Amino acid sequence: MTINTDIRALNEKIQLESQFVDLITMEMNKVIVGQKHLVECLLIGLLSDGHILLEGVPGLAKTLAINTLSKVIDAKFARIQFTPDLLPADLVGTMIYSQKREEFIVKKGPIFTNFVLADEINRAPAKVQSALLEAMQERQITIGENTYKLEAPFLVMATQNPIEQEGTYPLPEAQVDRFMLKVVINYPQKDEERLIIQQNLMKEFPKPNSILHPSDILKARDVVREVYMDEKIQKYIVDIVFATRKPADYGLAKFTEMITYGGSPRASICLAQAAKAYAFIKRRGYVIPEDVRAVCHDVMRHRIGLSYEAEATNLTTEEIISEILNTVEVP
């Protein structure tokens, strides 16, 4: 059997296995007006087992989007408002003494769920941020002397308000790097906002149907891993990430003094995983360069450090990524 035959068979399998993506999108569109990119990124994160950092002003349906997704796949959802007085125990749980049983018992925190919305994550102290990020990385929580596995799928969507920065605790670069995607959400278009008004003036707000089970997502993840990625695509991904570290090697010497640090190997891994998930969403069994380009900004924008010179000239990571994509040779 030739490679082409294998890929053709895999492609047919993916087309069949990915049909539920359209059903999820259809159910979410009943509730979410516009924000197609946000819905797409939620699916990428869900299918590639990656967490998402959202940046956008309040009122752009961030909570509604992840809550709706949890209902569509019949999963559990928790929204945690991060505040300066929040403690790690408020997040993960603690040991409490039961007078009835005359012993300490575990009271699990809200993080023991499938979908977590960590609202305004940069408002909580470093200890709380660290507790959340440990759960994201290890998929487990330690309370007292016992360690508890978190349910799968486990997806964290953390939000940051780009405008209000007073009284916040910015996330360290090492912790931000643990988010697979950083998605910037913009305001809806005029016609979309008119539909939002109409929707909210209806007698009953639309409700999504539960069409899947969390176990279906776990099965889908196994299929996503089977999506074929050629060595040329892998090299393309490595070149993109290396261009953020050594821009001069790729004819981008003008960025050498503008970038303080580039993407880590985790960036390469996340770019490959996100590209596979994107190909799956597009009902393909193989990754093409356009898949990598489609997810590149969301995967890389929080993994490039800008120097004072870059900030002084108003250079953004968006512009750097776009320039890299225009310069690095496409296979």
PLM regions and their residue ranges:
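Pre-Walker A (pre-P-loop) alpha-helix and adjacent loop at the N terminus of AAA/AAA+ ATPase modules
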Residues: 14-60, 242
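Conserved C-terminal "switch" segment of AAA+ ATPases
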Residues: 11-18, 31, 168, 182-254, ...
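Walker B catalytic acidic pair
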Residues: 56, 119-120, 131
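C-terminal engagement/docking regions of AAA+ P-loop ATPases
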Residues: 1-9, 14-15, 247-331
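Conserved alpha-helical scaffold flanking the Walker A/P-loop in AAA+ ATPase domains
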Residues: 41-44, 97-117, 146
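Conserved beta-strand position immediately N-terminal to the Walker
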Residues: 52, 116, 154
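Walker A/P-loop
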Residues: 46-83
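Canonical AAA+ ATPase core
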Residues: 98-103, 120, 124-128, 136-227, ...
